[in-house]
Regions:
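Short beta-strand/loop turn elements enriched in aromatics
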Residues: 118-139, 237-239, 252-263
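Transition-metal
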Residues: 1-134, 194-222, 247, 308
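Short, structured beta-strand/loop micro-motifs enriched in basic residues and often containing a Trp
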Residues: 141-149, 273-275
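An exposed, glycine/acidic-rich loop-and-rim segment of catalytic or binding clefts
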Residues: 145-151, 162-164, 170-221
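Ligand-binding loop in jelly-roll beta-barrel domains
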Residues: 78, 86-91, 100, 110-111, ...
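Acidic/His-leaning functional-site neighborhoods
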Residues: 226-289
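Short acidic-glycine-tyrosine-enriched beta hairpin
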Residues: 152-164, 178, 279-297
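His/acidic/aromatic-lined binding-pocket segments of jelly-roll/cupin-type domains
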Residues: 83-84, 92, 109, 114-117, ...
């Protein structure tokens, strides 16, 4: 019998983290500085484990390696995606991620293209999304001169906004923002600027200026243009589609039947509660639930009065 894969996952403590993962989602957090919940992950720095069914207790990396049929026997050698929720209680560093070629050559892992769905944002919250330098030479000079106000592009944000952040994009998440991030399964980050913060030992965190300059794009970031289709009890918005992933927002106000259109899908519930039905079996879902519908799930039903989900697939 086919079944969904619900997951138990890993909290990551961060210098900029807070308590919203507990306050908003009810997660049990181990400290007051939790910045990330790696909700669906097979990355070695934080691997999810299956919480139900015949694979209960198996980590996602092992499951992907040993049961590729559950993932459509796709060619990716490792599980390609990672879903996170980030609680930015303070600014994250200004940073950039490499593309696959640079990441594999210099770090031994994939690069990182990602995207952000803004779950919640305090009034006046901002992100850094791109920069104003017109050439690599100007970029280097502005960084060396620490001319951050002139260099960095700040954008105000609110709940429901979406940003596509391809590799090579200068970016930072600002204080007071809660984000669901869909990304390539990579943990490579090059810090450009960290607001001169010190860690618990009084040391400045490492910067990676030469690698950052190597990989930073020149020109404005290419954000996506979401497209919404409505039918009966479902509003489906395609947020972005590219070589790495497609990401949708589903808003469900009743009972909706689905048929498989991808080899497998990753689903995260951002609001509401309801039930998922697969092969005649009901599963309760609520805000904060994360699960995978593997390749052998050919059809399913979602039912709820005010469900909001982010759905992705490679």
């Amino acid at each position: 019998m086919s079944e969904p894969l619900f997951l138990n996952s890993v909290m990551q403590e961060k210098i900029w983290g807070g308590t919203k993962l507990r306050d908003e989602f009810g997660y049990d957090i181990p400290s007051e500085k939790i910045g990330e919940y790696w909700a669906i992950s097979a990355h070695p720095n934080g691997v999810s484990k299956v919480a139900n069914g015949r694979f209960e207790g198996t980590d996602l990396a092992t499951l992907y390696a040993e049961h590729r049929e559950l993932f459509g026997n796709r060619p990716e050698p490792v599980f390609p995606l990672l879903t996170k929720i980030l609680d930015a209680n303070d600014w994250l560093s200004v940073q950039v991620h490499p593309d696959d070629a640079y990441g594999l050559e210099h770090e031994g892992e994939l690069g990182k293209t990602e995207c952000w769905y803004i779950i919640a944002a305090d009034e006046g919250s901002e992100i850094i999304y791109g920069h104003n330098a017109k050439s690599k030479e100007e970029l280097r000079q502005q960084i060396e001169d620490k001319n951050w106000d002139a260099l960095l592009t700040k954008v105000p944000v609110k709940a429901g906004d979406f940003f596509y952040v391809p590799s090579g994009t200068m970016h930072a998440i600002g204080a007071g923002i809660l984000i669901l991030e869909t990304q390539q399964s990579s943990d490579t980050t090059y810090r450009v600027y960290d607001f001169d913060r010190k860690d618990d030992n009084g040391n400045l965190r490492e910067l990676h200026l030469e690698k950052s300059i190597d990989v930073l794009n020149i020109g404005e970031p290419a954000n996506s243009r979401p497209v919404t289709v409505k039918a009966d009890d479902l509003s489906s918005t395609l947020l972005v589609s590219n070589d790495f992933f497609a990401v949708y927002k589903w808003e469900i106000t009743g009972k909706v039947d689905f048929e498989k259109t991808a080899d497998y899908s990753l689903l995260s519930v951002l609001a509401g509660q309801g039930k998922l039905t697969v092969d005649g079996k009901d599963y309760s879902i609520q805000k904060g639930s994360h699960f995978i519908l593997p390749s052998d799930v050919e059809a399913w039903t979602l039912e709820g009065s005010d469900l909001e989900l982010i759905v992705s697939h490679p």
